[in-house]
Amino acid sequence: MPGKEAAGDVMKSSTKSNTKKMVQARLPFKRLNPVPKDEGCLEEKKIRIPQNVSPQKMLYSLNSSMEDMENDCEMETEMTPIPKAINGKGPLDNYIRKAPKASNAPSIITIDLTEDSNISTSNDSPLNGESRAQLANGTVSPERSTTNAPLSTNEECTVSVDNKSLENMSFPELELDKPHQSAASCTSVSNFSPERAVKEDYNSSADDDSVSVSSSSSPVSLSSPDVQTGSKFTNGSSPSTSTTPTGKATSNKTSAEKKKTKDKAEKRQAEKEERECARREARAAKDLAKKKREGEREQREKDKKEKKEREDREKAEKNRLKEEKKKEKLEALEAKQEEKRKKEEEKRQKEEEKRLKEEEKRIKAEKAEITRFLQKPKTPQAPKTFARSCGKFAPFEIKKGMALAPLCRIDFEQEASEELDIFLQEQTSESSFLDEIKKRRPRKMGQTTVPTINSVEVDDVQVLGETDPVLGSNMVLEEHIKDIGVPERKKFGRMKLLQFCENHRPAYWGTSNKRSRVINPRKPWAQDTDMLDYEVDSDEEWEEEEPGESLSHSEGENEDDDPKEEEDEDDDGFFVPHGYLSNDEGVSDEECTDPENQKVRQKLKAKEWDDLQSNSKKIRVLQPVVIGCVWCDSKASEIRLLQKFSACILESPAVEEELTQDISSAQKIKDRQILSKLVPLLHGNVNGSKIIIQEFQECCRRGLFLEDNASHATDIESTSPNSTPQTPSNIIVPSKARLKRLISENSVYEKRPEHRMCWYVHSDVLKGLQQDNLPVPCQWTYITQVNSVSKENNGANGGSLQSLPLSGKRKSAGSMPITKFMKRARDLETAVNTDMDGFQADTEEEEDDDDCMIIEDQQAKDAEDSTIECKINLNDSAILASCQN
């Protein structure tokens, strides 16, 4: 290849000398003697064009280099002004024309020792005058230059042309089959100026000529005009050189070498073309393979993408089908469970119905067994009475409680009919019926009642035989006894509810036959002081029951039991025959003390029950025997019967208001005295109000609060708590209602930071009573047997904790007898005596102590020992007094 040769023969011409000289071999692309350049000179721009490039591409590269050269020229012209053209010629044209002609001196041939054969210029390919002129003018045709002077690949020509001529140059397409056409050419065009050309002309010499070394691509460089002129003289033929025999021999030799070199160049060019063709084919095959691989890769990616999409669709379809199957399975399972649940529900309902039927049968059997002893005797049915046929009505049965109405509702007597006849005869036509209507005085006529005939039978007559010592005769009272049942509601009136929001006691639900003349629907808030006493607070008389034992531990034990069975068991307990009970069941605490009396009572009750069952006596509601009304012209027998029930009215003066005020002030003073004695026991006490009231009443009965009986109180405290001394006659024990009212008004049961839950008396009450320094908890010494347990179920710190006896303890719910829930009439002695737990019930005089006064009048005991007690009710308008001798 021409570009890879180490060096070549370079033909260099100079204006000063044309002698040949030997130059040293040099490496490619290395300048041995670089030409020094001025700092102001611009570097030459070399354009390398490969040999296989077409002329169109080479022209494009040349045009681009020309554009760069024009830009450089513009930059240079900006710095130095360009001289103006004279007669259409610039300084370059003048410079080329004024170039020196070739001298007659023998030309110097430069021989490169690195080449096999030296290539020199000969006369066979000289540049004639016409070509020189065209080269000088810049109009050298490439075709002509190549035909006249073919160049080898190792040759380098330096041509200097101006920019204008290069722009106007045209490079036609070269044919590769011509042997004299070069493989490729490159021109390096550099911008120059006249000043630069002059400097290079003066600085050029024979030893230091500018040498252009051919590269691997064998470029053609266009250098300065001095090199161009030198090449002209070198390539040109002179008369002296053409006539010498040495030049002929050299030209023959060089032509042979040139031909040989040309053959080699053609061979290399052919090989190069083959290699280029093979390279192009390989590149085309490579591009085709690359395109094929890219197509295959794109196809694979496309197939992979489609496969992935197809798999995703199949997977989504599978998931959808799976979800649908799962949903269907769930629906089927739910339907199956629903069906199973319905079957179980139906089965459970059937079992429940069956169990209820069996339960009803069992209950009926038990009731039949229980009521077998209490069956009523069947009474013979009365003969049915039928009414006779009258008019349109057929005969019908007259049942009990029915009466047949007469044909005429009014039964006329003979006297009434005679009076009617007289009125009919004496009537006149003067008075009109219309006049009576105009008077607007309608006459009233009451309801006609059907006369009832009381049929008195022997069984329905109640005979009361009694010998009255006053009348001295037996009196028989007959009354028709009504059917056994609930009293008629018409007789007692409606049930009424009396309830107020301020009251703590339960409301009243019952009948009330009293009617007020003051209170009516127009005045519902009026006060009837004659019938009601508005000063009496009924809440004070009401005693709330203490909270019972907690049954939370027993809750849920009998939840599985049938409630109907429990009712049956309770019913069975009521029908247990007498004598069947155990010794300690159904007996009160008082009866436990005497077992003999207990046995006697049980025997009497069993006998009474047997007699009642044997005689089949009916238990019915008692009805009073009403006698009256008694009029002045009544019979003497009725008056004599009712005479012993007559009431005597005592005349007494009216109650003065001052007396009422004195009583209220006296009550306040008494309440203050009681409170002063109650505060030491109440303040700081952890027990309940019932225990405190019981302890205070016991202290009052023993007279511990009397100031003049201190020694007596000391003796009583030293005695045993079980002993119950007699209450002095001059001591009044306050009632439970009064004590509870005082406790609730003057204290509060709460928890404070300094102590736990206990009673705290108000600070103003303590200051008023001058008892501010009372300890908390209280240091009271109890005289009764109490279990000091607070509402928190904690033991009291101040009180002495004493245990109750076994008889006073509360019995468990399982061993409670039935008679505990039944009312029992107490004798007067049991009401006065103390119970087993040490609590004495309040008497009637003690409860009504606020509203009553006890007047004692002790007369001379020697003459007559009698005491008169008068109980006066101050709240009623009438004063009733009862005296006892």
Swiss-Prot record:
Keywords: Cell cycle, Chaperone, Coiled coil, DNA damage, DNA repair, DNA replication, Nucleus
Compartments it resides in: Nucleus
Quaternary structure annotation from Swiss-Prot or TrEMBL: Homodimer.
Gene, per the UniProt record: chaf1a-b
Coiled coil: 251-376
Residue segments, region Necessary for homodimerization, competence for chromatin assembly: 629-665
Role summary: Involved in chromatin assembly in DNA replication and DNA repair.
Protein name per the record: Chromatin assembly factor 1 subunit A-B
Region annotation Disordered: where it falls in the sequence: 1-24, 115-157, 176-361, 536-605
Biased composition, class Acidic residues, residue ranges: 536-548, 557-573
GO BP annotation list: DNA repair; DNA replication; DNA replication-dependent chromatin assembly; nucleosome assembly
Composition bias type Low complexity, residue spans: 12-21, 211-227, 237-254
Family: Belongs to the CHAF1A family.
InterPro entries xrefs: CAF-1_p150_acidic, CAF1-p150_C2, CAF1_p150_N, CAF1A_DD
Gene Ontology cellular-component terms listed: CAF-1 complex; nucleus
Chief location bin: nucleus
Compositionally biased intervals (Polar residues): 116-128, 134-157, 182-193
